[in-house]
Amino acid sequence: AILLVEDSVRYYSTYLPELYKLILKQSAEFLKETLNEQQRKGRKRSRPKILLATNLDDAMIFYEKYKNNLLGVISDVGFVRHKEDSPDKEQLDAGIELVRYIRKDDPLMPVLLQSSQDAMSAVAQELGVGFIRKWSKTLMIQLGEYIKEEFGFGDFVFRDAERIEYGRASNLKDMEYLVKTIPDDVLIYNTSKNMFSKWF
């Protein structure tokens, strides 16, 4: 699952179709590899779901319920704490509180913060999470690139700790070959970051 935390109808109406497109594209790629009809049906049923939370309480509930199956989290910085709160009670750092909670529980969980405030970029960097500016003309491109890179969509890219690329697998045959040929330290780095489970 992907957890989207956003209280603006405008933004979640923009994000949801893009997320669905990425999921369907990834599912189609995986379906090319399945061997029989039963496996194909299983893959279709197991494609990631998108969980939409519009307040901090729901975000925490979704995180706790699905954390073992989350590919990542995309969160606004400011939103209300409780479902029944009016918009004027928006907590300007609710997203930061959520990120700290998630990081304490799972330091490897990919998280993307989004805000219209440029200053939040430094906060995201300090927290070790991605950041996109809401008003950016390339918002959807940045969102797609982050998801492909961090949520395990697209090719599996073997990188070392310095982010140097050692190989790219677009299917299981490529993966099998690369696992046998890349340096051991690169393989260990990728397994220690829990990257395989997201791609498979």
Regions of interest found by a model, annotated:
Residues 116-200:
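Long, compositionally biased intrinsically disordered regulatory segments in eukaryotic proteins
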